[in-house]
From Swiss-Prot:
InterPro entries: CmoB, Mo5U34_MeTrfas-like, SAM-dependent_MTases_sf. This is tRNA U34 carboxymethyltransferase. It catalyses: carboxy-S-adenosyl-L-methionine + 5-hydroxyuridine(34) in tRNA = 5-carboxymethoxyuridine(34) in tRNA + S-adenosyl-L-homocysteine + H(+). Homotetramer. HAMAP family: tRNA_carboxymethyltr_CmoB. Keywords: Transferase, tRNA processing. It comes from Salmonella newport (strain SL254). One of its GO terms (biological process) is tRNA wobble uridine modification. Its EC number is 2.5.1.-. The lineage of its organism: Bacteria, Pseudomonadati, Pseudomonadota, Gammaproteobacteria, Enterobacterales.
């Protein structure tokens, strides 16, 4: 059973303590009523993983854990099999005692694009909205964060996160909660808030920006990464039924339009830090994610377009500050 008591004890002693007025009841309701049909199978995979304490742990350059002496073939096989029971692995990669999880996304590439533009994360309390398996939570800790909290309602991601945590020595500096941003009160408690790969899935993107702002302390920093299209501050793509085979894509603004949205929501010092086209080297099918990936979502005769005829995915990073 995945428990959250350690997190409750941790925040009871800091400036997140007021979250305890609502959070335990929400988690209890989730445990009673909302668990996925495969959750028991996934949580069993986590439970059966061995307790490991890394001899060498690198969260600064990657997410890598090593033992002092190589694991036996049987130990490696056990870890590998249990981690494969948590497929598909979308966000990573992870290197855990000789088991290399080659995830669909090279999330380390995204981190390398984002990191140079951030305020120093040393000592910061961070929220990562839609954090997936929690890969970036560990990289935030590697960059000096005091506490990294991720929220994502996808229960497979929770189990993947807890599996990695167990293999990292039960590290308590990062935590993942199975919640959506709309379930959080206005905590106004995080020094940095990340929203990466979420905005285009929201029916009301400006409401999402307000929700993110409500989580930041005054002078806190927002890091927003999302799909964009080319154009000026009035350009927004509203896809039809699907975009790159995804049904739940609602609004894809240009980077200048997104900057304007942030300013309309009251953010200041808004800047476009990076814009780049997503490549089939960064998002692709692997043995840890065996279904369709980006190459299958692009027009085979014109890779600058999706199969639906829209511009192929490009992503922007915007940095903003709450006054």
């Amino acid at each position: 059973m995945i428990e959250f008591g350690n997190f409750y004890q941790l925040i009871a002693k800091n400036h997140l303590s007021h979250w305890l007025e609502t959070l335990p009841a929400q988690i209890a309701a989730w445990q009673r009523e909302q668990q996925h049909g495969l959750f028991k199978q996934w949580s069993n995979a986590v439970e059966f993983l061995p307790e490991m304490t890394p001899w060498r742990l690198d969260l600064l350059h990657s997410v890598t854990a090593e033992s002092e002496t190589p694991l036996s073939e049987g130990q490696l096989k056990r870890i590998d099999t249990l981690l494969r029971n948590l497929m598909p692995w979308r966000k990573g990669p992870f290197s855990l005692y000789g088991v290399d999880i080659d995830t669909e996304w090279r999330s380390d590439w995204k981190w390398d694009r984002v990191l140079p533009h951030l305020s120093d994360l040393t000592g910061r309390t961070i929220l990562d909205v839609g954090c997936g398996s929690g890969y970036h939570l560990w990289r935030m800790i590697g960059a000096g964060a005091h506490l990294a909290v991720g929220i994502d309602p996808t229960q497979l991601f929770l189990c993947q996160f807890e599996a990695v945590r167990k293999l990292l020595g039960n590290d308590q500096r990062a935590h993942l909660l199975p919640l959506g941003i709309e379930q959080l009160p206005a905590l106004k408690a995080f020094d940095t808030v990340f929203s990466m790969g979420v905005l285009y899935h929201r029916r009301s993107p400006l409401e999402h920006l307000w929700q993110l702002k409500d989580q930041l302390v005054n002078e806190g920093e927002l890091v927003l990464e999302t799909l964009v299209v080319d154009g000026d501050e009035n350009t927004v793509l509203v896809p039809g039924d699907r975009y790159a085979q995804m049904r739940n894509v609602y609004f894809i603004p240009s980077a200048p339009a997104l900057k304007k949205w942030l300013e309309k929501c009251g953010f200041i010092d808004v800047r476009i830090a990076d814009v780049c086209v997503t490549t089939t080297e960064e998002q692709r099918r692997t043995e840890w994610m065996v279904t369709e990936s980006l190459a299958d979502f692009l027009d085979p005769n014109d890779r600058s377009k999706t199969v639906e005829g829209y511009p192929a995915p490009q992503r922007a990073v915007l940095i903003a500050r709450k006054p």
